[in-house]
Amino acid sequence: MTNGNGTPPEGAPPQLNVLAQYTKDLSFENPNAPASLAPQQQQPAINIQINVGANNVGENEYEVTLSIEGKAESGSSVLFSFELAYAGVFRVLNVPQENLHPLIMIECPRLLFPFAREIIASAVRDGGFPPLMLDPVDFIGLYRQNLERAQQQGQPS
């Protein structure tokens, strides 16, 4: 809603709309099958890395990409590995400039995560393993870590 000149009325509530969600990239590898599908004597070591990126794609519209990579290993053998880039396009209105970056880098990936988690669980299950249910992610903590890392490297956030 605007006041006729394209600007929101004073005091308009903040809005965050999901315009689209999609898989940008998905890869699952089971490099040692069928041997990797045999019962394991111990729980595999699972390493997960999560990153968030964002691009402005239009007026008040941002593409946010949640990138999740993982690998399960037993001893020196890789059981499986995966990569997922899951994205959404979000429209953000009436948000103060100082709150825009945290909103995009915390709230948007938080909304995407349950869908990405399901895609990964299904891919791992379809690869012959029990579904991998990722633990919830602290996107506030991830955001703070990335800010600290950028400041240490002298980069803008």
UniProtKB/Swiss-Prot annotation:
Signal peptide: none annotated. Keywords: Chaperone, Cytoplasm, Protein transport, Translocation, Transport. SUPFAM superfamilies: SecB-like. It holds the Pfam family SecB. Gene3D superfamilies: SecB-like (3.10.420.10). It is found in: Cytoplasm. GO terms for molecular function: unfolded protein binding. GO terms for biological process: protein folding; protein tetramerization; protein transport. It comes from the Bacteria. One of the proteins required for the normal export of preproteins out of the cell cytoplasm. It is a molecular chaperone that binds to a subset of precursor proteins, maintaining them in a translocation-competent state. It also specifically binds to its receptor SecA. Homotetramer, a dimer of dimers. One homotetramer interacts with 1 SecA dimer. Belongs to the SecB family. NCBIfam families: PRK05751.1-3, secB. This is Protein-export protein SecB. It comes from Rhodopseudomonas palustris (strain TIE-1).
